[in-house]
């Protein structure tokens, strides 16, 4: 009886705090939290993704009900969305029998040694059974929609490659394949079959849950949007996790993604020029790129995530350096302008982390860093789309496939692909020389836009396989019309021989590439060399691309051919090598200078520049960026409507802006216990500056050349009233 009474009470509460079935929200910035509103985490994004009906299992704080948490954020003016995990979460009532009277801990993902893979205490990574999906729909999705939330984010559909040994997985195997389970470690074919099933299970899970959410929402007069926050294909492949990724973009029930890229994913080491090391900026650039290209042809919405810290405990200086690298990388994609500005603000603003790499002393976020971070995320609130392009020779794309995740673990027959070197071997030799390499997903080749901007397509089947033969028709048609294909590969990895479409049902090809080459009139095993097909060219290199980066200087021949194919065959112009990237986005200048590149020269940006990576917001006429560094600058010279008083850069968000003859005022909101700094553009030097009615004018804070006034004060989530008179 108590449980029934509790559920009825929640229903009444839900009715009382309905978020009025938000229609079109136009959310540009968002964040996720399992906490109720607190002054110290009120970062003023457009929306908040309230995490979990039962919260976040990693959050040990006193937990309010979902409805109470929703109400607390709604009262502060936020658009309310919902996020939870699809592979793990606060689902103990399911695992311990409260849902249907049966325990379900046996539905966790299990390794060869019989160990369950845990996300936390009593929180296993899940084999998503039909019963579990019913639980998610009934206990979670319904409750969220009943409160009036009309955007659902189901994050991290993850099946570990090392898993696949539980009884629940064996049952799913029998249902899917029609024959008994086979241990994945015993053969490449078993590994491939196991990975395909893992891929399918989360494809089915998201399709079922999202389809239900949309139908249930429709029954209540709501248009429910559904999104998948997910790591990139690059990261999941490197971390040996299987996830549906690109295939989800074609589902009508999927409205978009969050690209979960941050320091923790991008600092995963890779090889280049024979050296294994962290390359945070370069990896982040490729991660964001793989997420953009996954959805670009489909028109789905994409949020890019950055995190000012990471899951692994490090020091504040490390967090700052790598945050700047990932933040810059995301902004180099001018066609994306929606952002998750941070995950878990409670962890960022209130967590304790080391003060230096060599110290065990821990402190909360330093004021200078919280100020800088808030300046950066408020820039995201203003960040425009742009038709400007990133500098560098355009037109190189690396082909990717979801099956990249299928060959990572376990290895067979001694064939290794260290740190995803077969992928990085095609991308880093060019990216490190200032060429803005893009990625293309083989699953998207049916969209005519997929290869529209590609001049030279780089591909291999050493680390992935085509799941459908139709992709080869699309590639062949593209080459015939003038495209240039560089195929690198010995085609001797153990997955070439798995039972798949190229060697079954009337097909008898030794390798999938043999089928591709046949489409273009080539022999099944063309020797290394250059071949013509229609107006295009096929260049075959009988080397696995991992060898381009595993050895010092191993990319010389690849680069020679890439340049010749680009300039002579694709007729795309001179292939330019440099050590930097630069992009203009509206008022903003973005720059990144590479280490391990063609030179150690710095890159210089000139103009009237506000440095947004410096919490003092200094102004420069020239900003020098050294190798290994990045810059986010606001160029005052490009600001539209210079006679209009406006905040150019700020560690707060402005509301209630008003302008009159000789005055300008606004209310600044930002988290408590943080410091504000703002550069405000004014037509002339002010005579009066007030903060909450108190006069604070200081002539030394006026910068005549930029016509900006620098103002600083303590932040307040309730708002600080600022007024300028001149």
Ranges and model annotations:
Residues 25-33, 81-85, 153-157, 192-241, ...:
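Aromatic-lined carbohydrate-recognition surfaces of secreted/lumenal glycan-active proteins
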Residues 41-44, 51-52, 155, 217, ...:
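Hydrophobic targeting/anchoring helices
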Residues 42-43, 417-503, 548, 598-599, ...:
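Helical hinge/lid and interdomain linker segments adjacent to catalytic or ligand-binding clefts
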Residues 65-119, 150-161, 217-228:
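Glycine-rich, aromatic-flanked loop segments that form ligand/cofactor-binding clefts
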Residues 82-147, 181-199, 207:
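Active-site-adjacent "subsite" loops/lids of carbohydrate-active enzymes
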């Amino acid at each position: 009886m108590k449980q029934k009474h509790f559920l009825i009470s929640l229903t009444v509460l839900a009715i009382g705090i309905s978020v009025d079935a938000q229609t079109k929200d136009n959310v540009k910035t968002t964040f996720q939290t399992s906490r109720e509103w607190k002054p110290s985490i009120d970062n003023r994004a457009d929306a908040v993704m309230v995490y979990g009906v039962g919260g976040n299992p990693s959050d040990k704080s006193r937990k309010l009900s979902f409805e109470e948490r929703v109400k607390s954020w709604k009262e502060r003016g936020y658009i309310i969305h919902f996020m939870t995990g699809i592979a793990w979460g606060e689902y103990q009532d399911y695992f311990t029998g409260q849902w249907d009277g049966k325990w379900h801990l046996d539905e966790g993902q299990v390794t060869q040694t019989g160990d369950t893979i845990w996300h936390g205490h009593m929180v296993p990574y899940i084999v998503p059974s039909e019963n579990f999906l019913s639980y998610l729909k009934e206990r979670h999705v319904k409750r969220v929609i009943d409160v009036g939330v009309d955007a659902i984010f189901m994050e991290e559909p993850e099946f570990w490659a090392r898993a696949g040994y539980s009884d629940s997985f064996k049952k799913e195997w029998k249902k899917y394949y029609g024959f008994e389970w086979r241990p994945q470690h015993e053969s490449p074919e078993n590994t491939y079959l196991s990975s395909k099933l893992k891929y399918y299970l989360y494809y089915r899970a998201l399709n079922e849950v999202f389809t239900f959410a949309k139908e249930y929402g429709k029954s209540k007069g709501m248009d429910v949007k559904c999104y998948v926050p997910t790591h990139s294909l690059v990261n999941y492949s490197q971390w040996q996790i299987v996830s549906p990724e690109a295939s989800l973009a074609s589902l009508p029930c999927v409205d978009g993604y969050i690209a979960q890229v941050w320091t923790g994913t991008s600092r995963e080491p890779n090889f280049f020029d024979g050296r294994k090391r962290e390359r945070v900026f370069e990896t982040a650039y490729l991660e964001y790129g793989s997420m953009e290209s996954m959805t670009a042809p489909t028109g789905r919405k994409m949020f890019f995530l950055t995190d000012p810290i990471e899951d692994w405990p490090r020091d504040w200086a490390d967090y700052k350096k790598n945050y700047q690298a990932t933040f810059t990388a995301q902004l180099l994609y001018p066609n994306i302008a929606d952002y998750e500005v941070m995950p878990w603000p409670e962890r960022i603003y209130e967590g304790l982390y080391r003060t230096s790499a060599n110290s065990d002393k821990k402190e909360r976020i330093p004021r200078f860093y919280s100020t800088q971070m808030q300046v950066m995320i408020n820039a995201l609130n203003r960040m425009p789309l742009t038709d400007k392009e990133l500098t560098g020779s355009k037109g190189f794309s690396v082909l990717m496939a979801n099956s990249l995740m299928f060959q990572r673990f376990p290895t067979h027959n001694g064939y290794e692909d260290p740190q995803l070197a077969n992928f990085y071997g095609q991308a880093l030799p060019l990216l490190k020389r200032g060429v803005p390499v893009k990625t293309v997903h083989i699953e998207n080749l049916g969209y005519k836009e997929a290869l529209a901007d590609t001049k030279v397509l780089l591909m291999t089947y050493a680390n992935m396989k085509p799941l459908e033969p139709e992709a080869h028709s699309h590639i062949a048609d593209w080459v015939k019309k003038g495209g240039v294909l560089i195929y690198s590969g010995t085609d001797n990895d153990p997955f070439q021989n798995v039972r798949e479409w190229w060697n079954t049902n009337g097909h008898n090809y030794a390798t999938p590439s043999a089928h591709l080459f046949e489409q273009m009139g080539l022999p099944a095993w063309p020797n290394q060399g250059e071949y013509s097909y229609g107006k295009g060219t096929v260049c075959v290199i009988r080397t696995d691309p991992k060898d381009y980066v595993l050895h010092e200087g191993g990319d010389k021949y690849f680069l020679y051919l890439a340049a010749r194919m680009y300039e002579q065959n694709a007729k795309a112009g001179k292939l330019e090598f440099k050590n930097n990237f630069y992009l203009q986005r509206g008022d903003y200048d973005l720059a990144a200078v590479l280490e391990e590149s063609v030179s150690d020269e710095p890159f210089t940006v000139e103009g009237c520049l506000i440095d947004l990576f410096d919490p003092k917001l200094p102004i420069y006429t020239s900003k020098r960026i050294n190798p290994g560094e990045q810059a986010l600058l606001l160029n005052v010279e490009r600001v539209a409507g210079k006679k209009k008083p406006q905040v150019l850069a700020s560690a707060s968000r402005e509301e209630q802006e008003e302008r009159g003859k000789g005055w300008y005022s606004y209310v600044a909101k930002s988290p408590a216990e943080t410091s504000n700094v703002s550069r405000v553009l004014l037509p002339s030097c002010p005579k009066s500056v007030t903060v909450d009615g108190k006069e604070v004018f200081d002539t030394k804070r006026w910068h005549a050349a930029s016509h900006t006034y620098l103002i600083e004060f303590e932040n307040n989530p309730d708002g600080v009233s600022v007024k300028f008179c001149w």
